[in-house]
Amino acid sequence: MTVYADNAATTRMSRTALDAMLPAMEENYGNPSSLHSVGQRAAELLMKSRETVARCLNCQPREIIFTSGGSEADNQALLSAAAIGRRKGKMHIISTAFEHHAILHTLKKLEKEGFQVELLPVHENGMVSARQVAGAIREDTCLVTVMFANNEIGSILPIEEIGAVCREKGILFHTDAVQAAGHLPIDVQAQHIDMLSLSGHKFHGPKGVGALYVRGGIPLVNVIEGGAQERGKRAGTENVPGIAGMAAALEDACAHMEENRVKVTALRDRLIQGLSKIPHSAVNGDLEHRLPGNVSFCFEGIEGESLLLLLDAAGICASSGSACTSGSLDPSHVLLAIGRPHEVAHGSLRLSLCEWNTQEEVDHILREVPRVVEYLRSMSPVWKDLESGKKAFML
């Protein structure tokens, strides 16, 4: 049996997405900027896809910019907000300590350009409050960027409350919704969101395509220079097949969101309950405000990479954190942000489920993870020191 439990890293593309993409490659293959009929058919498909994404977010189609993915959308949002702030003499940006690296690395770049970046501390349950955001706002704050839901530990942030604070203060609010889109209700109007990033491959769409929502009237900085595509805000011939697939996948995910949430949450909770029985283990993230498919644990006395390799040999595909940092010897910055010690953070496991996972697959995980953890601990000198009392248990 092979169990794919790494859906936070990427998802298998749905038949709905594939069926939307094939006509764009076989029939409507023209350049949407061309004036002839084949090009105009592609342009029409592009327009319909934009309308679909806009409906799912409750915004206007003209407020959607198609990108190559979430990272590009994040970069364009932050650089655009920074440019607005620089013109107004406002050089203070608020974010959190456990954002995706697409946000954190861009903020580092802006720091080198003279911006002051304030990273709010994260509570041990993986939450940041609207009160924290309100308390950090200054006269020279130009942007607040807070992720909708964390990719590693699954905590869902109070986006509507944070958005309301920013709207009241007249400060731009961006959210990285890459993990939330297609899984959680998003309404950019009700949630007071000015800019939002999403990525198609997180909800059974294709890789290499994403979108940036930008509230009307907010000027954008071009990250890619060239032609006049995307209203002159994102150069390069649009990836029409990818965009069509992403739009179809998002529409399908939103249509079945509640039934998927109920099914996946039940699988998640069963996994959390079963894995919690392993001695000296701990769940990461908030148990109530949590992505439906996210299961994140730390196991004391083991190393996460060894755990992943042995689980893979047992047919279980998982991760020890973000796939974007796979292979790094450093512990997860997310786990460190919620207060996990280095030695504990190294023994992390993330299982991320979707509606295609089954009870039988959960049974397999619940058999194999305890077995592998016990096996690794039996060989670990760190575990022996913990058992002998030379070192104190932390979990």
Tell what function each PLM region has.
Residues 1-395:
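Pyridoxal 5′-phosphate
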